[in-house]
Amino acid sequence: SVNIQEVVVTGEKNIVEKTQTSMIEVPIEQIKTIPALLGEVDVSKAIQLLPGVQSSEGSSGFYVRGGGPDQNLILLDGVPVYNASHIGGLFSVFNADAIKTVRLTKGGFPARFGGRLSSVLQIDMKEGNMKEFRGDATIGLISSKLTLEGPIFKDKTSFIVAGRRTYADLFVKPFMPESTDLTLYFYDLNAK
């Protein structure tokens, strides 16, 4: 016969596990690799490519689980954005150079996001560079962008300013009657 010592088995399990199966986080680096209309990176168009999201042609609005574009709560750093597009929905108001993360929750979102039925799109802006001043400039087919960032107090607080302006008005102007004051352009300024 063999004597065996007593074996004690203990275990722990959380009674409630927190999982969000309907939340998708898309890194901005991945969004920047998606082919874009006239080279203009568009966060809203990238969201339209996700599973469970439908789009309409030529518009930055998106449909989630049968709801309309007005049933999506869009937040920029926690602040609601009510009109998230320019030029009738061709371009979104979000400058990809100023964005850090994009998260889409397609259902089962917390009550604090009330007032919408379909989804919550959370967009967080980048923090400025805490170590050194830095700038980026981009000239594209339809717009130009400038981003400046740096420390206000080194390693404590920082700033980021990102601006974008289209120059579609320069292309359209020769085809417009001289008597009209109609211009076709937009500009954005994001600062944090």
Regions flagged by a language model, labelled:
Residues 1, 43-46, 62, 89-95, ...:
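N-terminal periplasmic accessory domains that precede
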Residues 1-35, 44, 69-71:
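Short, acidic, small-residue-rich periplasmic hinge/interaction motif at the N-terminus
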Residues 5, 70-72, 98, 131-135, ...:
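Outer-envelope beta-barrel architecture signal
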Residues 33-35, 79-106, 184:
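Short acidic/polar hinge/loop motifs at secondary-structure boundaries
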Residues 35-83, 100:
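Extracytoplasmic beta-strand/coil segments of soluble accessory domains associated
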Residues 55, 116, 130, 137-141, ...:
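Transmembrane beta-barrel outer-membrane domains
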Residues 86, 132-134, 175-180:
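Extracellular loop and loop/strand-boundary signature of outer-membrane beta-barrel proteins
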Residues 140-165, 178-192:
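Transmembrane beta-barrel wall of Gram-negative outer-membrane proteins
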